[in-house]
Amino acid sequence: MPPEEDGNWQFHRGLQPWKGGIEMYGEFEHTIDSKGRMNFPAKLREELGEHFYISKTIGENCLTVHTEHSWNALRESLKGKPQTVRLPIERFLFGGACEAEPDKQGRIAIAPALRAYAGLTSEVVVVGMDDHAEIWDKAAYRAYTESI
């Protein structure tokens, strides 16, 4: 159900589970180089397409990777919202977001502000989450999974 239908942004965390057609799953460990680049899993790149977006994740210290379609659907879903609802979400999600296009080696660059928000060190885990992916610092992800 789109967030505009139930108004529960914390639950949806800015994602679009209604978009369908995408299946991402698995955990993939990678490293980030000194320029903020990482090899993005080929299996997930196939699902995301050639152009996608990376944003902060509401409620978690990780990053969300959106398809171009889901990113545009999120933008559209916010247009009719009152400013008191829309502006804080837009500032949080769009203000620090970056576009990603894998290079010939399959690497993507993650903006410094996004790396800082998620506490990304040189070791990260990319997690397939059905219709989107998340990028976590490896130690933070291990601590999170051990706590549940």
Language model regions located:
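Flexible "stalk/tail and boundary" regions
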Residues: 1-30, 34, 43-100, 104-105, ...
